[in-house]
């Protein structure tokens, strides 16, 4: 396993966080309309992945549906077909799959994928989302990079897709913001101890902390 350099396209272009969303215009974060808008503007795109109940990577930030839809409860208790019928609040869009997002982007702009922590504790990963992501990216023609707050996910992706650049999403890990994560664990992750172990090539850090 080797460290893979981040393509220049990720540094030349602005990267739209959760795509180019604008709620007043009906473009909700991580939605097809937000993805199309970012591509049209020539901007790179960052999206988040959660796993459906039937093992499909879904482009959605939260682990629960409540904030962005009229539904409630965990994303991972619904199938991809069920999630694909749930409308995003304030939009005509529904929750897209990774495959649908890739088809919209079609290699025209760089894509940064954050794999959301499925353990919810920054603990070991069962590897299901990582495996589904690697499979979904197989054969995709375009610049892609992967990242996660959870170093276990980054390490897993390094084994499954060693050809793709990977990074660690980091934070100040204020215990008040990361409860119930214990303070010693916050201090551990604050030091970014897994950067070299995962052969990461970049860090994505929360802007307010810089």
What is the predicted role of each segment?
Residues 1-210:
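Phosphate-group recognition and catalysis centered on beta-loop-alpha active-site segments
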């Amino acid at each position: 396993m080797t460290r893979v350099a981040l393509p220049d396209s990720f540094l030349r272009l602005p990267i739209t966080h959760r795509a180019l969303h604008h709620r007043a215009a009906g473009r909700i974060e991580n939605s097809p309309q937000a993805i199309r808008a970012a591509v049209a503007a020539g901007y790179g795109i960052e999206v988040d992945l959660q796993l459906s109940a039937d093992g499909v990577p879904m482009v959605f930030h939260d682990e629960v549906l409540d904030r962005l839809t009229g539904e409630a409860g965990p994303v991972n208790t619904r199938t991809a077909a069920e999630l694909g019928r749930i409308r995003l609040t304030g939009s005509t869009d529904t929750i897209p799959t990774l495959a649908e997002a890739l088809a919209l982007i079609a290699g025209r702009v760089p894509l940064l994928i954050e794999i959301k922590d499925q353990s919810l504790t920054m603990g070991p990963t069962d590897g299901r989302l990582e495996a589904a992501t690697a499979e979904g990216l197989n054969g995709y023609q375009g610049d892609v990079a992967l990242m996660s707050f959870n170093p276990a996910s980054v390490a897993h992706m390094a084994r499954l897709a060693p050809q793709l650049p990977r990074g660690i999403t980091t934070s100040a890990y204020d215990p008040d913001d990361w409860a119930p994560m214990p303070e010693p664990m916050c201090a551990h992750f604050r030091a970014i101890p897994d950067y070299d172990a995962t052969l990461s090539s970049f860090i994505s850090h929360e802007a307010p902390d810089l």
